[in-house]
Amino acid sequence: ALDVTIQAQVIDLMKDLVDEFHMGIIFITHDLGVVAQTCDRVNVMYLGRLIEEGPVREVIRNPKHPYTQGLISALPKLDNLDQSLTAVPGDIPSPLERPSGCVFNTRCSQIVGAACTTIGPNAVDLGADHTVACHIYKEVAE
């Protein structure tokens, strides 16, 4: 973890490198605030599985997967710093013993039936270059 000043300097250096060398950077972090400031696209992963993908603004303003929604709701609100942070419920399963079906099903509050616990969801195109792997959105694809 970097202090805020060093973090800002490192991010500025990365942006300069991207501009100077016309390249991209894969930035791996849990800090969605930094993602919002620095990235054009975001891939949200859970237990090694891609669960949501799209332009940063679209995913942060309109998160679709319950895990992404939980991450967004866990961010501190600048207009109410006294408010308790919301945690994503449940315990993280072992990556060596992933749950069957959707990898998030043991922590999900939006289970839609047996499919969530038996079948891994496919990515569904929601438009605006935004995809989600969640059985909630299965109807969109059909």
Predicted segments, located by residue:
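Short catalytic/signature loops enriched in Gly
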Residues: P55-E142
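P-loop NTP-binding/switch modules centered on Walker-like glycine-rich loops
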Residues: L2, I6-S84
